[in-house]
Amino acid sequence: RLSLVGSEMCIRDSSKASLSEIQRLWSGLGYYSRARNLFECSMVINSRFNNNFPESEKELLKLPGIGTYTAAAISAIAFNNRSVVIDGNIKRVISRLFFLKKPIKSNYNEIWRFTNLVTPDIRVGDFVQALMDLGSQICKPSKPLCESCPLILKCDARKLSLIHI
């Protein structure tokens, strides 16, 4: 019997389960499309990747329900591959750090380019998680805690007193 609580469910286990069993286990967690994607991913990983979770963004994008952000995040955080990860927090940090003038919502390519410039080749997962934490805890959407920011001396928006971005 499968359980999501108190044990580790491996790809092999989930690929042997039925969709209804995965959905039953998922009950109460919300986002029910994720249960279906988990089931479908396990099938693809079992058949196409011999039960080995793919590590590269390119391979991860072949999995159902995995988009650009999720593929980059898994590749960087789980496998420490150099991937450019961009979530809402990272967009805000990068936009302020380099004082990118276009609105965040319409500036993905420029944000990607600058994020790529600062993404290291080593300890990528640590870097990505640190940027996410920085954006959620210090470089907040409103009332950022600039005085607590480790990047205060490098931040172009702060230098220009334009932290409203």
At which residue positions do the language-model features occur?
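Generic alpha-helical secondary structure signal
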Residues: 8, 12, 20, 36, ...
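Single conserved hydrophobic/aromatic residue that forms the stacking wall/gate
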Residues: 1-11, 163-164
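Contiguous mid-protein beta-loop-alpha structural module that forms a pocket-lining wall or clamp
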Residues: 56, 66-162
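Short coil/turn segments at secondary-structure junctions
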Residues: 10, 25, 74-77
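Alpha-helical ds-nucleic-acid-binding substructure associated with the helix-hairpin-helix region
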Residues: 12-64, 68
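ATP/adenylate-binding site constellation spanning eukaryotic-like Ser/Thr protein kinases
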Residues: 6, 16-19, 87
